[in-house]
Amino acid sequence: MVIIMETQKLKIRDIITVTLLTLINIVIFFASSLLYLNPITVLLMPVIYGLVEGVVYFAIGTKVKKRGAMLIYCVLRGILGGYLPYIICYVLAGFVAEFIMAKTGYGSVKGLTLSYVIIELLAALGGTFYPYVIAADSFFRDAAALVESGEMNIHVVDAAEILRSWVSVALVAAIVVASFVGALIAGKIMKKHLSGMNKSV
């Protein structure tokens, strides 16, 4: 029992692995600034994240099958997002992910899929739905001045207007579907990668 518990503890190399892998998704996050082309691409950003970020998440889940790995991933993602509601939602997502993985088993595809979908939803809540819908009045109070000064993209303002309608429900559904598809793709990639490693050994 002691041996099992010891193997479940994160080591320095595990933390480094999680951090380096997380940086890949953080680069994707910052590169997404290229998507501020129009209001539609702005709204599609969390959908695109759901499709492409799963590979890194599953890589962490299959390489570091230990308690705390998913929490570290979420904390790093949240903090480097630099927006308090986004940070809070990501940290909450990290605890939810850890709970799910503890129940399903670390490395479980089912657990990774479920936790990934929830993480992407909570990330969208903190980064898109909260500022654009829930706190829109305060977030866009000085929108005109910010747009004029270049501190805010006009497409963000237009996207928020669109989102404050039935589109918000459609976006939630799209994020769930995209995240699930992203998880399926990631699962297949990881399965192929691991089987390839086993053959080479």
Q: Would you name each region that the model predicts?
A:
Residues 87, 115-191:
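Membrane-embedded alpha-helical hairpins and interfacial helices in multi-pass inner-membrane proteins
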Residues 34-38, 42, 75-100:
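Interfacial aromatic-anchored transmembrane helix boundaries in multi-pass membrane proteins
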Residues 2-20, 24, 31, 158-201:
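Alpha-helical transmembrane segments and their cytosolic interface
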Residues 32-40, 64, 68, 100, ...:
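Membrane-interfacial segments
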Residues 22-30, 75-84, 119-128:
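Aromatic-anchored segments of alpha-helical transmembrane domains
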Residues 15-19, 47-48, 70-72, 87-92, ...:
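Hydrophobic alpha-helical transmembrane segments
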Residues 27, 91-128, 183:
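Short helix-perturbing small/polar motifs within transmembrane alpha-helices
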Residues 2, 6-72:
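Hydrophobic transmembrane alpha-helices
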